[in-house]
Amino acid sequence: MINKNSFPEQNKFGISIEDSGYALLDSTWYRENECSPFSRLYFIKGGSGYLKKDGKTIPIKGGFVYLVPAECQFSYGCESLEKLYFHISVLTSEKYELLAGIKEIY
């Protein structure tokens, strides 16, 4: 077990919401090779769509939550999709984006 008091500065981080909202989407929600400095958190309420990373297509559907890490290059699209979204930054005390460099979509 790690004593958190041994590394007080390393245990400090902040989460900020850069943008958030509700969206009812159609086929115009489409982008290739998107890459953002923030992470995206999608709560899918209904419909279906996809996220694509390194040639792998990840179906997205109602009732699930998806995380696209900061600086992750991906594509997306749908025919009909209802979602809540949050664009977030998770920064360490040194202003390093904690989720940057994660190569998978969850």
Predicted regions mapped to residue ranges:
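Short, intrinsically disordered, charge-balanced linker/junction segments flanking boundaries
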Residues: 87-89, 103-106
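Catalytic core of bacterial cyclic-dinucleotide metallophosphodiesterases
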Residues: 99
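Short beta-strand segments
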Residues: 66-68, 85-87
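Generic protein-terminus/edge-of-domain signal
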Residues: 1-59, 64, 72, 78-80, ...
